[in-house]
């Protein structure tokens, strides 16, 4: 997606006009314009020059983002222009100048005429002089705020009226009619028609013309200031980017601008300094605070070979590192780019506002014209009718309509970024909260992904220390993942590391054997150990209990005699069960996917508290499982992104967990920087809060216009005598956008990890707790076309216990989902009876 800056937009009608113009350019497949950030994202093959030309033809300005930069200098972190709030100071100066001239204008028009406040002697009883003074002061205020007239009438000429058009028409009509009344009063005074003079004097609306412009400027300043607050999170990320780095060149330390750092350069970081770019530690060790990227305040220990990231703080030791990712490739720059891209996209709910915005301003102008005509036909004066029409123009607010969605999206996205939760698009931020089913990959998501020693059970006559020492010595030469758990425990317990076994041998799928000081040590699974040692029934039952708890029992023997069991398991993370409880509190069904056998899977599922366990799922079968789950509701798939890409893509929402510094996971819609499952309910909670905020903003905007426009038009005058002065209409318009933005800023106070106010969503159906299903993948030869697929699918799904079958003749596979145990022979016979050959079932 190419990014562009867009200038000249003032309301939702403007952004809709730009979007419509760019979508007509040949080669553009998608265009999204953000009124909040004055930016535009365009996808397709169209040339930037053609896109810019289309925007300019529509009456606005455009430029390609980052076009002036190249190479490493094009880092998103270096976008200083974005950090500067240039809009608010300009509006403030315009407002101060307007107030300087509005004050005497209001004094003359309201103070003297209504309350008899004193005026200079030459103006006493000189109504023409009073009128001319008001005219001159109004002209000055209009010149100061000429931006409204230039943009407003330019939009009108291009057939795209906007908020500025409404302001310009309202203020211009007030000024035009007042000028007419002034000249008519002058003629009356020359003719000594004092009744005419007094009548026309009360038809002056100069103060309304100036006050409308000033009040709208007040609203614009409040809006600009508040909009600046919505991007605080993104600005904070940009400010984290280091400006310089200390490189080692020819043995000397040289400080250089960050743009000059290249991949492979060696840099040094002292305690208290920020790490300039992503790299690998070559020398030294330290504790690094990564809260800037992950939101985790606890420092992470870094040693030789560990990765470090730009903008993180080196808290303790001196480290020498090699640069691995610089410029736009650093983790920080990717995060900034992701947040920026999300801000440039539109949530589906924004389409409601877009559709309304396209016709809103023309409709308001039409309503104002009809209002004036009706009141004139009803016998009211031109001044009265015009006041009602002007009130309609200035109270209507398309700007608030355009800001209702993007400000909430920006604040919500920023809140997520500060807490290590990255939403890739506005659509993903909106959709996450609608999740009904969460599918969790077991390894690395529910569990730590690293086996840990859970039980050390020595045989009679052997103590724990002796068992651990012998097991540690034997496992030292093993490359099996389970061996690492025992080695880690041995190191923690201070086991003698000098002992070495001889004649070491590893038996695949069985165990290990070796000699130590003339004795034979053996270790492995039950089947392997029974070949060399006797295992009693009591020990067998003990191992079965361990297996039922999701643990893997490893047996050890010395000279053919069992010396004990050490149980190893991929233990669930500390926050996993709490996260599942929080998801349940939201009314979300939780499903666990794993390739483990049913017994182990059910044990882990029980510990985590999930609703359903789907065991025996191979990596390629996860996508099929997600496809079936989607028939039951909106599905979010949570995985580590390594072998979960198809499932993450297939799900309504793909969530990659534990990405750490590697956030470039294309398959995911949401990236969680920390390996913390509790961030999943937090992301859903934040999404729901953001969507609720958008609904509040849209309701307020529509409610405001539905109530305000009839009031301004004078609908209630015949019944209650209620009428709205154009000045109060302008004040209401100026405050409406401010209220919308301020409401969005309330999201900054939202506590995304607080489950106290969670509400359950309506589920499609009740599901039985701990329902267990399995999948089997069949390799089938002989399928040639879609007809073959349909035949095999129908055959398999006719078997009792088969819930679904996903068949592919191209891959030569059938992924079968089972709700009950079905023997492989039954599946094989059913398929082969249809003249296909089954070569394997897993």
Model-found features: residue ranges?
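Conserved catalytic phosphorylation-site environment of P-type ATPases
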Residues: 293, 352, 387, 400-474, ...
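Transmembrane helix-loop-helix hairpins at the membrane interface
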Residues: 90-244, 355, 721-726, 732
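Conserved cytosolic catalytic loops of P-type ATPases
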Residues: 26-43, 48-49, 203-204, 235-329, ...
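Conserved ATP-binding TGD loop and adjacent catalytic N/P-domain core of P-type ATPases
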Residues: 16, 435, 516-518, 550-552, ...
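Juxtamembrane coupling segments of multi-pass membrane pumps/enzymes
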Residues: 185-189, 194-195, 210-271, 302, ...
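ATP-driven catalytic headpiece of P-type ATPases
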Residues: 93, 312, 433-440, 446-479, ...
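Membrane-embedded alpha-helical bundles of multi-pass transporters
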Residues: 114-128, 157, 176, 415, ...
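Flexible metal-binding regulatory segments at protein termini and peripheral loops
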Residues: 1-129, 154, 227, 252-253, ...
